[in-house]
């Protein structure tokens, strides 16, 4: 579960991506509570240099991909880099994706009333798995956050899940 910490300094950084960073930190706080258990390890990551080329996420993928699922030290039962099952990137959480274009029209991929936009990349090697993950979250959102309707889009670009999208389901 990730977000990027950097932003442009002319006013948008609180949303792009201070909002995503705050959400990831809150999720980490909640999931680290003693009474919360999960069946899988959840890694929380805050990337840097997204605005200048996804450099932090690319560095992580390049440095850690080959280490997935390798026990270290051998026989310890410890896996410093768990096998990746998916990536959930939070970017611009306060953006109103339902706003119409300047001419008043809406994107075909977004509902006019959508407050949550869940995107995957349809050209990724694992696009089918990413699409399933996106619709899983959309369906969960429809069930648990009925005041915040969600839409799924298939043109995810230029965010920190991009370096992962050919290796795991990424939204």
Regions found by a protein language model. Give the residues of each.
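A residue-level signal for beta-strand positions that form part of recognition/binding surfaces
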Residues: 41, 84, 170
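Metal-dependent peptidase/peptidase-like ectodomains
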Residues: 47-158, 167
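Short, well-ordered alpha-helices that flank and scaffold nucleotide-derived cofactor binding pockets
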Residues: 25, 29, 33, 62, ...
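Short, surface-exposed beta-strand/loop micro-motifs that present aromatic residues
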Residues: 161-163, 171
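Alpha-helical metal-binding/catalytic segments enriched in His/Glu/Asp
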Residues: 1-54
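Amphipathic alpha-helical segments that form well-ordered structural scaffolds
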Residues: 23-26, 30, 132-140, 163
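General alpha-helical segment detector with a strong preference for membrane-spanning helices
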Residues: 8-10, 95, 164
């Amino acid at each position: 579960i990730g977000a990027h910490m950097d932003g442009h300094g002319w006013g948008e950084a609180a949303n792009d991506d201070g909002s995503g960073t705050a959400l990831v930190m809150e999720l980490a706080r909640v999931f680290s509570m003693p009474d919360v258990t999960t069946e899988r390890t959840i890694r929380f990551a805050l990337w840097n240099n997204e605005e200048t080329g996804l450099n932090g996420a690319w560095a992580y993928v390049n440095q850690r991909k080959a280490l997935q699922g390798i026990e270290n030290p051998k026989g310890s039962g410890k896996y410093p880099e768990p096998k990746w099952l998916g990536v959930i990137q939070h970017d611009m959480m306060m953006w109103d994706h339902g706003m119409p274009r300047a001419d008043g029209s809406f994107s075909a991929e977004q509902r006019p009333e959508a407050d949550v936009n869940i995107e995957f990349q349809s050209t990724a090697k694992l696009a089918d798995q990413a699409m399933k993950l996106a619709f899983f979250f959309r369906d969960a959102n429809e069930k648990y956050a009925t005041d915040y309707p969600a839409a799924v889009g298939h043109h995810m670009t230029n965010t920190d899940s991009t370096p992962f999208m050919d290796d795991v389901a990424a939204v």
